Curated annotation (Swiss-Prot):
This is GTP cyclohydrolase 1. Toroid-shaped homodecamer, composed of two pentamers of five dimers. GO terms for molecular function: GTP binding; GTP cyclohydrolase I activity; zinc ion binding. The lineage of its organism: Bacteria, Pseudomonadati, Pseudomonadota, Gammaproteobacteria, Pasteurellales. Keywords: GTP-binding, Hydrolase, Metal-binding, Nucleotide-binding, One-carbon metabolism, Zinc. Belongs to the GTP cyclohydrolase I family. InterPro entries: GTP-CH-I_C/QueF, GTP-CH-I_N, GTP_CycHdrlase_I, GTP_CycHdrlase_I_CS, GTP_CycHdrlase_I_dom. HAMAP family: FolE. It catalyses: GTP + H2O = 7,8-dihydroneopterin 3'-triphosphate + formate + H(+). The gene is folE.
């Protein structure tokens, strides 16, 4: 079993404490066994749909789906995959807002297992620690790689960054298109969903919040 880092454990415990962890169970099978089982079941699902898996274009699709689920689009369900964090002591006494805009978001709607496509913006006021900018993108990617609802994802990101950075002063903005709306049902190709989560000074001070929103809503 892969080792889970202390940062990952702290984040997971914080999410559980707040009641915003993704509904998950601990798997009892090894990854290769789970891939084999998923492939077997997907083979039957595809047959029930009416597809002929003897066709060379389709015969490996169950295996491809199993690998994609376990190793790629749902890899964020395994905290062993949580990004390795190197926190840097804030020796320069950075006190201004640190903000990363337009982080690519590609996730999966947990209701229909179709794509959520959008952008994330994260900002924080450093206290004792800062982290490398790419780590912000990696944390967003980790939580995107699991079945999600946008509202919970936004809150998970807020709590994760607050936990790692050891500060409440964090803001998260998510703007996304949901293919469960775009590609099925109402088939609305124009609408998008925006969610926000604020902590600390972003929650308490309107001007700070406005400063953050002024850049993300351009």
């Amino acid at each position: 079993m892969s080792k889970i880092s202390l940062d990952a454990l702290n984040v997971r415990n914080a999410l559980i404490e707040k009641g915003i962890e993704t509904p998950m169970i601990d798997p009892t099978q090894a990854k290769n066994e789970r891939r084999e089982s998923i492939a077997k079941h997907m083979h039957e699902v595809m047959k029930l749909i009416g597809l002929d898996l003897r066709d060379d274009s389709l015969e490996e699709t169950p295996n491809r789906l199993a690998k994609m689920f376990i190793d790629e689009i749902f890899s964020g369900m395994d905290y062993a995959n949580f990004p390795k964090m190197t926190k840097i002591k804030n020796q320069m006494k950075v006190s201004e807002m640190v903000q990363v805009n337009d982080i690519t978001l590609t996730s999966t709607c947990e209701h229909h297992f179709v794509t959520i496509d959008g952008k994330v913006c994260v900002a924080y006021y450093p206290k004792d620690w800062v982290i490398g900018l790419s780590k912000i993108n990696r944390i967003v990617s980790f939580f995107a790689q699991r079945p999600q609802v946008q509202e919970r994802l936004t809150e998970q990101l807020l709590t994760a960054f607050q936990t790692i950075l050891e500060t409440d002063d964090v803001a998260v903005y998510v703007k996304a298109t949901h293919f469960c709306v775009k590609a099925r049902g109402i088939r609305d190709t124009n609408s998008y969903t925006v969610t926000y989560a604020y902590g600390g000074v972003f929650l308490e001070d309107r001007d700070t919040r406005k400063e953050f929103l002024a850049t993300v809503q351009k």
